[in-house]
Amino acid sequence: MRPAGRSANQVRPVTLTRNYTKHAEGSVLVEFGDTKVLCTASIEEGVPRFLKGQGQGWITAEYGMLPRATHTRNAREAAKGKQGGRTMEIQRLIARALRAAVDLKTLGEFTITLDCDVIQADGGTRTASISGACVALADALNKLVANGKLKTNPMKGMVAAVSVGIVNGEALCDLEYVEDSAAETDMNVVMTEDGRIIEVQGTAEGEPFSHEELLTLLALARGGIESIVATQKAALEN
């Protein structure tokens, strides 16, 4: 029995609260069970130097956790004077995932920064960040079109992510912290709304996993992502 009584293929309750803050062009509070992340999308005119003159835009991301997002307080990375390796890995993942959702040529010379700040962590913070940031990005792009700065919306479709893993020999979807910490295999999967894979991060923490188990985990992830995408689309219609 899973901690919340979920079935093996069931994601936690997902809530996406749009327009959560007033200044950013897109803002979403995303909740995957007890994991809560504030995602904002900020638009700036211009692109990084390596893209100047190429007529395309750029999407980048930053990720962080509030000091008491976890069971015990973690010092702010700003106080330490540098970002940790985990933080850099996650924010690069978020940026790669969301660039797959957008036609950068159609975006033109705009940069959109996605800031994902974890308020409360209970497993799956990077996958929640991607899923919430995609909705914030959609709102920001809609504003560019509504304001006449873009003629065509460059959004190609939704992108979402979910964690999957093997816990006590059973393949599970959307691991919460107690499951994640006990997992023999832990995997994060990012997909487009039509089920194409953007990224798979998978590690055998204990016993190596088989090819058949990998396919089972990917199938679980696809089902979970389909559910998350349906929630994203419903949120954008409200």
UniProtKB/Swiss-Prot annotation:
Gene3D superfamilies: GHMP Kinase, N-terminal domain. It catalyses: tRNA(n+1) + phosphate = tRNA(n) + a ribonucleoside 5'-diphosphate. GO terms for biological process: rRNA catabolic process; rRNA processing; tRNA processing. CDD domains: RNase_PH_bact. Keywords: Nucleotidyltransferase, RNA-binding, rRNA processing, Transferase, tRNA processing, tRNA-binding. It is an enzyme of class 2 (transferase). One of its GO terms (molecular function) is 3'-5'-RNA exonuclease activity. InterPro entries: ExoRNase_PH_dom1, ExoRNase_PH_dom2, ExoRNase_PH_dom2_sf, PNPase/RNase_PH_dom_sf, Ribosomal_Su5_D2-typ_SF, RNase_PH, RNase_PH_bac-type, RNase_PH_CS. Phosphate binds at residues 86, 124-126. PROSITE patterns: RIBONUCLEASE_PH. Its EC number is 2.7.7.56. Phosphorolytic 3'-5' exoribonuclease that plays an important role in tRNA 3'-end maturation. Removes nucleotide residues following the 3'-CCA terminus of tRNAs; can also add nucleotides to the ends of RNA molecules by using nucleoside diphosphates as substrates, but this may not be physiologically important. Probably plays a role in initiation of 16S rRNA degradation (leading to ribosome degradation) during starvation. Belongs to the RNase PH family. PANTHER family: EXOSOME COMPLEX COMPONENT, EXOSOME COMPLEX COMPONENT RRP41. Homohexameric ring arranged as a trimer of dimers. This is Ribonuclease PH. The gene is rph.
